[in-house]
Amino acid sequence: MLYFVKMAVLRGVKMMDIRHLRYFVSIVDNDFNLSRASQNLYVSQPALSMMITEFENRENIQIFKRASGKIIGLTFAGENYYRDAKEVIKRYNDMRTNLYKSKDCKKGTITIGIPPLVLSAVFSSVLPHLILKNPDINFIIKEIGAYALKSELLLDKVDLAVLLYPERISKNIIDSIEIHSSELALFLSPKHVLAKKQQITWADLHQQKMAIFDQTFMIHHHLKEAFERNNCYPDIVLDSSCWDFLLSAVKTNKELLTILPLPMAELYHSKEFLCRKIESPVPWKVTLCRQRKTVYTHLEEYIFDKLLEAFRPTK
């Protein structure tokens, strides 16, 4: 079969270039309707007709059956040529794919925007592994809050962005795939008055002193919406872009609360703070996003696929 395909490639290169082979196959696939084929190929109908005539005259062979001047089917030679042409096109596409996969897709620069907290909680093992496996790729990691990252993605300042669902960007503009799911939880000092409760209600948080992420983080906006929705109005005494500062603040101040993703409690065990789940919690869903494009670079496709693969559940 490989020999047959190679011979077909040689015949195809000599008799028709790959572009003309695609034209020929498209004519057959469109039931010999030149008008429809030309529209699908974005070429003029006269150009298609001329290509057919020139080919048959040059090779002194008829590949199309005709009736009243119209193409109605394939001759025996045409059927063989159609079969060979499809093999050649497939082989050509495979060759191009393998060429770039084996070389260019693993070289270059890729910029990924990841919120600092997500970087620690979700990407701490995935990203170093990916970087070590691809030494010829220059990874630029932008640590920015997810809310600010939305603009970076839309302005083409990052190739990929890790955001939180709901991103509130039209699905016509971005591709978004969930890679991690958890919830937000309350973090507090063991000496806080709420420390004795095993589960916290939103009413418990009303008028409590609280430190939260600043407005560049989507968690900030999700929390503000949750407070409003649950008629809960805590006393926000400070906001910050540093999750470790928020955690340290509650460890050293028994009157202060903060709300962070639940995985932080699993990653950083300490007797200096407690973690309590919240009744009807705010979901914390991490998504891998990219702008919708007609064509992506091989490097963009490669890294996007590798990240999705890393977070795919193992069977």
From Swiss-Prot:
Gene Ontology molecular-function annotations: DNA-binding transcription factor activity; sequence-specific DNA binding
What the entry lists under Gene3D superfamilies is as follows: 3.40.190.290, Winged helix-like DNA-binding domain superfamily/Winged helix DNA-binding domain
Q: Where is the HTH lysR-type domain?
A: 16-74
Query: Single GO cellular component annotation?
Result: cytosol
Key words of the record: DNA-binding, Transcription, Transcription regulation
Give start and end residues of each DNA-binding region.
Answer: 34-53
Q: Which GO terms describe its biological process?
A: regulation of DNA-templated transcription
**Keyword Lyase, does the record have it?**
no
| Cross-referenced InterPro entries | HTH-type_LysR_regulators (IPR050950), LysR_subst-bd (IPR005119), Tscrpt_reg_HTH_LysR (IPR000847), WH-like_DNA-bd_sf (IPR036388), WH_DNA-bd_sf (IPR036390)
Query: Which parts form a coiled-coil structure per UniProt?
Result: none
Q: Which family does it belong to?
A: Belongs to the LysR transcriptional regulatory family.
- The name under which this protein is listed is Uncharacterized HTH-type transcriptional regulator HI_0775
Source organism (scientific name): Haemophilus influenzae (strain ATCC 51907 / DSM 11121 / KW20 / Rd)
* Lineage, opening ranks: Bacteria, Pseudomonadati, Pseudomonadota, Gammaproteobacteria, Pasteurellales
